[in-house]
A protein has these predicted regions:
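Small-residue-biased structural context
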Residues: 2-160
Length: 160
């Protein structure tokens, strides 16, 4: 397959746009990077890209959850369950005996983009509005949360 044909085979690519911002710089930067990783999914490097994506999702979820917990976000447990459900869906997809094909890569990209946009524009945006509307400035809270990995998602995929 030629490079031109390969590029035509990537119909479900969604670019980051400012409309996806939730108002928390660290989270917005992490979301932007997630879109970049999803966009990079292709058959030639799928295993490497999926590994990198999972590692980054572990870090992002951990950071986001730490912010929620530290700030006393009332919907923290609910949000945590959404992350766990996502992890289970990804585990099911990756646990399949099917090998990687162009169609399967497209299916994964479509699922990830749809989930990311839906999650960011509803649940993460709700958190962003809640946090930024609080009388206590959110900047110190965000700076206190060091990037880390762990939790349910890390255990599910054998990450440390």
């Amino acid at each position: 397959m030629t490079t031109e044909a390969t590029h035509k085979r990537v119909p479900f690519v969604i670019e980051w746009r400012d409309g996806f911002k939730i108002g928390i710089d660290q989270v917005d930067q992490e979301h932007r990077h997630l879109f970049t990783l999803v966009r990079a999914l292709n058959l030639a490097s799928v295993d490497h890209t999926v590994d990198e994506l999972l590692d980054y999702v572990v870090t992002h979820f951990s950071n986001e959850q730490a912010m929620m917990e530290k700030s006393g976000y009332p919907a923290f447990e609910q949000h945590l369950k959404l992350h766990e459900e996502f992890a289970a869906q990804v585990a099911e997809f990756l646990g399949s005996d099917q090998g990687w094909t162009e169609d399967r890569v497209q299916e994964m990209r479509k699922f990830l983009n749809k989930w990311l946009i839906g999650h960011i524009m509803t649940h993460d945006l709700r958190f962003g509005k809640w946090l930024t509307s609080r009388p206590v400035p959110s900047a110190p809270l965000v700076q206190q949360v060091a990037p880390k990995s762990g939790g349910f998602f890390a255990r599910l995929f054998g990450r440390k």
